[in-house]
From Swiss-Prot:
Official protein name in the record: 4-hydroxy-3-methylbut-2-en-1-yl diphosphate synthase (flavodoxin)
Keyword Iron listed: yes
EC number: 1.17.7.3
Cofactor requirements of the protein: [4Fe-4S] cluster
Keyword Oxidoreductase: yes
Originating organism: Pseudomonas entomophila (strain L48)
InterPro entries per the UniProt record, alphabetical: Dihydropteroate_synth-like_sf, IspG_bac, IspG_bac-typ, NO2/SO3_Rdtase_4Fe4S_sf
Enzyme class, spelled out: oxidoreductase
Length: 369
């Protein structure tokens, strides 16, 4: 039962990616990207639906050629979530997906081409009310900036971004967001800090090519956590060499840890020791798997003994403290005792019951205005 986040978010202009607000007072949006062959429409739609089920707000889809652009148009008709088209090298692909109803265009200023090509993309976006993401990446900086700085640096990333922000300003186009990604945490964090002081547009956060599930999660949590704690960031994407659904889960876990978004269960669990009165690790693994479908924000404490158990349980919607027998707390008050037999089954029932009650109470509160 933790309160609102104490973080004061950076002021930014609000834009819309489809029906999802980004920036301003909007919640921080969680984004992911498909890793299917875009030309395989059925596989891509199926993966997008899995991402939607996991709670994704925005999905990016790679569009490497014109065949993929046509497939993108078919995909767009079959999903409800806003889609961002990831465009590199060929500006004509951006023009085509704009015709096909894309919700946002992601272009890389290091490879999209001459100024007249950027103008053509901007005109197409303006005519259709499509926002743009300027996506600067340490691995694809413009050649003159590589020569000037010798290697990717925070200053180089920001100079690249500002160069293209100024270009869009000259074209009187303000409906855009910006990212300055690097695989190095310190480089990315410093680049975002510098950029946040110089523009009003929303910032899309990410540590690019962060790694596999474990290492990428840690690297992203450290980098994005630093920025989000400073109020920087309007959308996030956790780049993992893993199932994209894991990106969404990790994204929400990072936001939940900072009290910036609430979705599903926030588990508080001890690492266990010889004082535990039930198998904490086994109990946690089973509960996490069984309760993935719950979307109601709920704090659940699973503590193996009475050292910290009562204190944590009293701060949770549902809390389990190990003992002989174990004691369950509901809304901070002792509720009932449970033996280890069927412990997970009984605890799951209590959590689902509490989730249903909270959902009903939240709905009534919203209805009252």
């Amino acid at each position: 039962m933790h309160g609102e986040s104490p973080i004061k978010r950076r002021e930014s202009r609000k834009i819309w990616v489809g029906n999802v607000p980004v920036g301003g007072d909007a919640p921080i949006a969680v984004q992911s990207m498909t890793n299917t062959d875009t030309n395989d429409v059925a596989a891509t739609v199926a993966q997008i639906q899995r991402l939607v089920d996991a709670g994704v707000d925005i999905v990016r889809v790679s569009v490497p050629d014109m065949d993929a652009a046509e497939a993108f148009g078919k995909i767009k008709k079959l999903v409800s979530v806003p889609l961002v088209a990831d465009i590199h090298f060929d500006y004509k692909i951006a023009l085509r997906v704009a015709e096909l109803g894309v919700d946002c265009l992601r272009i890389n200023p290091g490879n999209i081409g001459r100024e007249d090509r950027v103008r053509a993309v901007v005109d197409a976006a303006r005519d259709r009310g499509i926002p743009i993401r300027i996506g600067v990446n340490a691995g694809s900086l413009e050649k003159d900036l590589q020569k000037k700085y010798g290697e990717p640096t925070p200053a180089a990333l920001v100079e690249s971004a500002l160069r293209h922000v100024e270009h869009l300003d000259r074209l009187d186009f303000q409906d855009f967001k910006v990212s300055v990604k690097a695989s190095d945490v310190f480089m990315a964090v410093e680049a975002y800090r510098l950029l946040a002081k110089q523009i009003i547009q929303p910032l899309h956060l990410g540590i690019t090519e962060a790694g596999g599930l474990r290492s990428g999660t840690v690297k992203s949590a450290v980098g994005l956590g630093m920025l989000l704690a400073e109020g920087i960031g309007d959308t996030i994407r956790i780049s993992l060499a893993a199932d994209p659904v894991e990106e969404v889960k990790v994204g929400y876990d990072i936001l939940k840890s900072l009290h910036l978004r609430s979705r599903g269960i926030n588990f508080i669990a001890c690492p266990s020791c010889s004082r535990q009165n039930f198998d904490v690790v086994k109990t946690m693994n089973e509960l996490e798997g069984r309760l993935e479908d719950l979307l109601v924000p709920l704090d659940v404490a699973v503590i193996g003994c009475v050292v910290n158990g009562p204190g944590e349980a009293k701060e949770s919607h549902v809390g389990l403290t190990g003992g002989t027998p174990n004691l369950v707390y509901i809304d901070g008050k002792p509720s009932q005792k449970l033996n280890n037999d069927n412990l997970v089954d009984e605890l799951e029932k209590l959590i689902r019951q509490k989730a249903a009650e909270k959902a009903e109470a939240d709905a009534a509160l919203i209805a009252r205005g």
